[in-house]
């Protein structure tokens, strides 16, 4: 079983590391090509392209400039510990045991605009390059055209290595669009998280993102390997709703706190 999650815009390169083990990203030749394109952008162009403030554009121009091909614990940190968004608040990888990291390294993948696919312990230099950004490159008009089948092929390698054919899609639509479902050698299961608001259940972005992290943690902590085991997920008040679910979609609901 392979879990897919999105990266985060917020990064943490300060907190103490909970493991010293690391691996290197497997698609760095591709990353280097994107860095080459990104370095051509001025801070104002970055600001417009990414719809971010001038200050953030300056920070990210510096990140593109400072990026180097040699990754070490001095200039990079493990991806699962560097990302700090809502998904990662739910995941809480900073509390993982070494055995948890082992299982995650086999069964969890982070999709990335710059790195393509990251394993949890892959070192990552800081960046911001969302998958949906229209960064023109030698392969096309955006990052989806740049990555083409590369991400899907890498996921197929991971599935083959574990002798499995199930992908748990906990990534956002923006990121999962970089995967070619018809070329993926797997059944795709998508957990959906609905929160009650004024008597109606709906997707509330902040809660849904955190729940994706909670579900990832649930799978890792309990060493789950079969999709039917996911129905036992009950973190922070969520429960499985069989009536609302289908073969490819597992629906979890949570009542509003009264």
Curated annotation (Swiss-Prot):
Q: Where on the tree of life does the source sit, at the highest rank?
A: Bacteria
Q: What is the lineage of its organism?
A: Bacteria, Pseudomonadati, Pseudomonadota, Gammaproteobacteria, Enterobacterales
Name this polypeptide is given? UPF0246 protein YaaA
Q: Which gene encodes it?
A: yaaA
Instruction: Give the UniProt family note.
Output: Belongs to the UPF0246 family.
- Which InterPro entries does this chain map to? YaaA
Biological process terms in GO annotation: response to hydroperoxide
Tell me one Pfam family matched here.
H2O2_YaaD
Example GO CC term: the record gives: cytosol
């Amino acid at each position: 079983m392979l879990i897919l999650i999105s990266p985060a815009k917020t990064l943490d390169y300060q907190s103490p590391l909970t493991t010293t083990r690391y691996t290197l990203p497997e698609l760095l030749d591709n990353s280097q090509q994107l860095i080459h394109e990104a370095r051509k952008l001025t801070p104002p162009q970055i600001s417009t392209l990414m719809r971010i403030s001038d200050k953030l554009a300056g920070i990210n121009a510096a990140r593109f400039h400072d990026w180097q091909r040699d990754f070490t614990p001095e200039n990079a940190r493990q991806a699962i510990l560097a990302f700090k968004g809502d998904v990662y608040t739910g995941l809480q990888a900073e509390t993982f045991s070494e055995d948890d990291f082992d299982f995650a390294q086999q069964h969890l993948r982070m999709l990335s605009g710059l790195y393509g696919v990251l394993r949890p312990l892959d070192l990552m230099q800081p960046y911001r390059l969302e998958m949906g950004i229209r960064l023109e490159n030698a392969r096309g008009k955006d990052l989806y055209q740049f990555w083409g089948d590369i991400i899907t092929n890498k996921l197929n390698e991971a599935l083959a290595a574990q002798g499995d054919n199930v992908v748990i899609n906990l990534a956002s639509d923006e990121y999962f669009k970089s995967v070619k479902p018809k070329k993926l050698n797997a059944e795709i299961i998508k957990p959906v998280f609905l929160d009650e608001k004024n008597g109606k259940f709906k997707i509330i972005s902040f809660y849904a993102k955190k729940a994706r992290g909670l579900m990832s943690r649930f799978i890792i902590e309990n060493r789950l390997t079969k999709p039917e085991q996911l129905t036992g997920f009950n973190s922070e008040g969520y429960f499985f709703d069989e009536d609302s679910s289908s073969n490819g979609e597992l629906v979890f609901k949570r009542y509003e706190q009264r």
